[in-house]
Structures are given as C-alpha cells and as structure tokens.
Amino acid sequence: MIKLNLSNLQHFAHKKGGGSTSNGRDSQAKRLGAKAADGQTVSGGSILYRQRGTHIYPGVNVGRGGDDTLFAKVEGVVRFERKGRDKKQVSVYPIAK
C-alpha cells in the first residue's frame, strides 16, 4: 500500500502579482506666460511675462529678472513687438501727460 504525505501540498498563486510602476505623479503648474496684455497700462515693477529662457526679449523700459521674468521699469502702456524676423520683444512706453 502506498502512503501519501498530504502535509507537503504546495499552493501556487492563481493571480499574478500586482507589480509596481514608476509613473503616477505630476509636477505643479508653474503659471508661466503673459501677465499683462498689449495696450494695458502698468505701473513700474509690474510683471509683464513669466518664462523659462528668453522666449520674449526685453524692449524699451523693460527689465529681465534672474529667472528670465520680464518686468516694467516705468509706468506706461505695454506693447508686444517683433524684434527682427523671428524674435519678439515687449516694451513699455510712458504715457504722455
């Protein structure tokens, strides 16, 4: 007579393991872009355009911050202009009083 040892039964998984993924997260939006429109009146120190790199160049009465943000140096009217054939710039022209 053959004796079976039933205490040595092994149960294998009937479903695959869940695994993991390296995705599933996203960075916060940086709120880049134009902060003042063409023709809008701004005061000195106002932020005109937030950017990474020089997508738009500073023109008349416009400064560039350390993070490439463009800001008005004087109070005036904002104008987005072409600079040459393929570049853009933003200028602020003082209001004549």
Curated annotation (Swiss-Prot):
Protein name: Large ribosomal subunit protein bL27
Keyword Ribosomal protein: yes
Cellular component aspect of the GO annotation: cytosolic large ribosomal subunit
PANTHER family listed in its UniProt record: LARGE RIBOSOMAL SUBUNIT PROTEIN BL27M (PTHR15893:SF0), RIBOSOMAL PROTEIN L27 (PTHR15893)
Gene that produces this protein: rpmA
Cross-referenced Pfam families: Ribosomal_L27 (PF01016)
Residue ranges the record assigns to the propeptide: 1-12
NCBIfam families: L27
Keywords carried by this UniProt record: Ribonucleoprotein, Ribosomal protein
Species assigned in the record: Streptococcus equi subsp. equi (strain 4047)
InterPro entries, A to Z: Ribosomal_bL27, Ribosomal_bL27_CS
GO molecular function: structural constituent of ribosome
GO biological-process terms attached to the record: translation
Family: Belongs to the bacterial ribosomal protein bL27 family.
Matches recorded under Gene3D superfamilies: 2.40.50.100
Region (Disordered): 13-38
Hydrolase listed as a keyword: no
PTM comment text: The N-terminus is cleaved by ribosomal processing cysteine protease Prp.
